[in-house]
Amino acid sequence: SWVRLRDRRSGREFRVLSLHLDHISHEARLAQVRAVEEETSQYPAGVPQVLAGDFNSRPSNPVAGVLVGAGWVDAFVEANGEDAEHMSFHRFEGDAYKPKKGTPGRIDYIFLKGTGIRVVSSAFVKDCVGGKYPSDHYFLTADIVIE
């Protein structure tokens, strides 16, 4: 899904895109992210773009690398440093969740691309009410500026 928006004060247009990549097939995720990159690359650099969602891939996976290689900036890493590795999926268990195999990792992202767009901060929100989480993922936020 995507939407093209216009800032009322500046008149500047920008795009916000949301996705949820396949959770089973690595090949499907690669094909999906390549299709998204192909579509988004049709817009000039002067149109800032924000791409957010569940990529079902850790930062070291080639799926994220497709976007980084095409000039997208990982907002969380930009705001928190290259070594920022956090778990974003938790199966409604919060910090008590321990994966059966491997180590926990971040699979949710906010990417930025274009001139005049930058991240100010990015963090995971771990809200729960009465021990119940509204999602099996922590919410990822980013404060961005479009100049």
Q: Model-predicted segments: where are they?
A:
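A short, histidine- and acid-enriched strand-loop-helix "catalytic/donor-clamping" loop
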Residues: I24
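Structured beta-strand-rich core segments of catalytic domains in phosphoester-bond hydrolases
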Residues: S1-E13, L21, V120-F124
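Short, well-ordered beta-strand elements
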Residues: R15-L19, A142
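Active-site metal-binding loops of divalent metal-dependent hydrolases
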Residues: L19-L21, D54-F55, Y138
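Metal-dependent phosphoester-hydrolase catalytic domains
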Residues: R4, E27, A31, S41-Q49, ...
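Hydrophobic/aromatic residues located in beta-strands of well-ordered beta-sheets
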Residues: V16, Q49-L51
